[in-house]
């Protein structure tokens, strides 16, 4: 499937997302925090009015960047969330947090959503003892995700956990051992999800186009 693999620094600056929020980048060296304005010659001085549509579109684009989604995937998850009981925006984020690649990132077993997806696709991980190699695999609360013993010892896996273990892990995820895997404890509350988006805007964006 086609995927946007452009420079994340530019994408983050354009959307105002600190690069350190989606990768292992040191916040002190984060280009978005050092230059909190869009890229380009006039990024720091440009003055433009922003329409309601542009605000909604921006929030949707931020969500896609946080989770590494294509438009078709993002719309499909929204449609599922809109059919579920509860607040659509919160349910949308809960569904995305329940993805296998998202949980691997939240547990600090990977340095970015791209690397988490790579670990999954290469078959490094098992969910409740069964191999899972689809990044969008929906993990159920109470399930355990573990590296296969041989893969857990790989240098890239060990290095990723070493770089990320100083980061805080949300309460709905429990790290098993020294980077052996994770337990998905429960569905997260909205305030626990480390994603800075205005989800009502995202709901409005898709609702107007359904």
From Swiss-Prot:
GO terms for biological process: ribosomal small subunit biogenesis; translation. PROSITE patterns: RIBOSOMAL_S4, S4. Residues 98-161 form the S4 RNA-binding domain. Residues 23-33 have a biased composition (Basic and acidic residues). The keyword Metal-binding does not apply. Part of the 30S ribosomal subunit. Contacts protein S5. The interaction surface between S4 and S5 is involved in control of translational fidelity. Belongs to the universal ribosomal protein uS4 family. This is Small ribosomal subunit protein uS4B. It comes from Myxococcus xanthus (strain DK1622). The gene is rpsD2.
